[in-house]
């Protein structure tokens, strides 16, 4: 099975000049675990996750600061034509929970999260809260 068959395509993205506050609000309101930071060409520049949000609040970083100051850079990605097994190995070896999926030109086309793997492996469906 290829990554493109199990990835989520409607990924929430933001620009690196968005504020931290705006990103945290998006995580909360959309019930998501990560936001992919993209450039004007749709290429992945970084990622901001729930764990990043907790770190930012704990370190008392000003919430009006831009995401570029706190996002994780040098993001691990995977090609959409990669296999499920390749994606699984990448997630495990890098200890990550969110894996942006890119096309051959490096443009972000989807996202694989640990929840997608659990669903694929064990048929576990995660329901969004009301």
Question: Over which residues does each language-model region extend?
Answer:
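A short, polar/charged loop-to-alpha-helix boundary motif
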Residues: 54-67, 118-130
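A glycine-centered beta-loop-beta connector
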Residues: 27, 35-51, 91, 99-115
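The conserved cystathionine-beta-synthase
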Residues: 13-31, 38, 78-95, 102, ...
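Cytosolic regulatory modules rich in charged/polar residues
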Residues: 83, 104-130
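Nucleotide phosphate-binding site architecture
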Residues: 4, 12, 21, 54-55, ...
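Bateman (tandem CBS) regulatory domains
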Residues: 1-11, 65-75
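Conserved protein kinase catalytic domain
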Residues: 7, 24, 45, 54, ...
